[in-house]
């Protein structure tokens, strides 16, 4: 294909196949990418930011282990450790996820190949991807660094996250899931606060979605700790669909709104301790069966019970009523939004299109919220000199 103006983005694959850092054509025309961006109905700021990222990305070239300098550890989980790193040849700061896998070379190469679809995932609601490679028993996935970290980290500092902020988060998650489904036929498979990243510019982006079936299979044993966000139908072994992502998406704002993982549901006494007042509604009522003695390992906050075993948690999710937001504290629209996400039967659960026009989302979309300002003051980040409101969410 002859080069056209503007200058094309170079995504060069490694010659030996150990680092497949580019697309199959080895060269993607910026003009074609810009055309794809136009299809996404982005505002001017979002388009400029995506183009800036893609322009930076062409400086990267082939990714090699020796080219990285570790700055700090950002977190661990989902089968890997994530570091903030400097890519010395380009000067870019990235997030590098290292996944240690004892696998055969053919499987490893298949995983690297499958990860290449991430080069095509360019959206304001998806974390940017620089490339993936294998070195010394570890697969490295190199991504855009989000300086606000993940929402589970933010929640630990905030205690609880306000409804207005969660409205902006919900919009970004719906738009991110819609983009993955409509443009790439991808389901996320692991929506939870730790996989929603934020930054000081007010952007909210999804990461760690299931593009590589082989990687999911290879890491199957390491997913035990995140199963608490799985939908009832996943535990029952029925067909997985995007509706399962909706359940996880509904559970996440409940956790962030009340300040702890909401299964088992907090009782009236605990809610009173949380919110400093008597709370009305179903969430404050005694559950139909005695509450299990434990809590999930992923819980934090006021719940001091011993951890709930995974089989107890599975039984609770499948057989007990789904979590709800307490009324009297949150708006009716927010409560209804969550309820529609957390319907046990996936066929009755709201879909992405229905959620996008839900009253809570419409209201949140219209609200002026300084997400960047809230985030920076909450976690002690310096705000950029040109702060943005809600980052075009």
Swiss-Prot record:
It comes from the Eukaryota. ATP binds at residues 74-82, 97. Signal peptide: none annotated. Ras proteins such as HRAS mediate the activation of RAF proteins such as RAF1 or BRAF which in turn activate extracellular signal-regulated kinases (ERK) through MAPK (mitogen-activated protein kinases) and ERK kinases MAP2K1/MEK1 and MAP2K2/MEK2. Activation occurs through phosphorylation of Ser-218 and Ser-222. MAP2K1/MEK1 binds KSR1 or KSR2 releasing the inhibitory intramolecular interaction between KSR1 or KSR2 protein kinase and N-terminal domains. This allows KSR1 or KSR2 dimerization with BRAF leading to BRAF activation and phosphorylation of MAP2K1. InterPro entries: Kinase-like_dom_sf, MAP_kinase_kinase, Prot_kinase_dom, Protein_kinase_ATP_BS. Phosphorylation at Ser-218 and Ser-222 by MAP kinase kinase kinases (BRAF or MEKK1) positively regulates the kinase activity. Also phosphorylated at Thr-292 by MAPK1/ERK2 and at Ser-298 by PAK. MAPK1/ERK2 phosphorylation of Thr-292 occurs in response to cellular adhesion and leads to inhibition of Ser-298 phosphorylation by PAK. Autophosphorylated at Ser-218 and Ser-222, autophosphosphorylation is promoted by NEK10 following UV irradiation. The active site is at 190 (proton acceptor). Found in a complex with at least BRAF, HRAS, MAP2K1, MAPK3/ERK1 and RGS14. Forms a heterodimer with MAP2K2/MEK2. Forms heterodimers with KSR2 which further dimerize to form tetramers. Interacts with KSR1 or KSR2 and BRAF; the interaction with KSR1 or KSR2 mediates KSR1-BRAF or KSR2-BRAF dimerization. Interacts with ARBB2, LAMTOR3, MAPK1/ERK2 and RAF1. Interacts with MAPK1/ERK2. Interacts with MORG1. Interacts with PPARG. Interacts with isoform 1 of VRK2. Interacts with SGK1. Interacts with BIRC6/bruce. Interacts with KAT7; the interaction promotes KAT7 phosphorylation. This is Dual specificity mitogen-activated protein kinase kinase 1. It comes from Pan troglodytes.
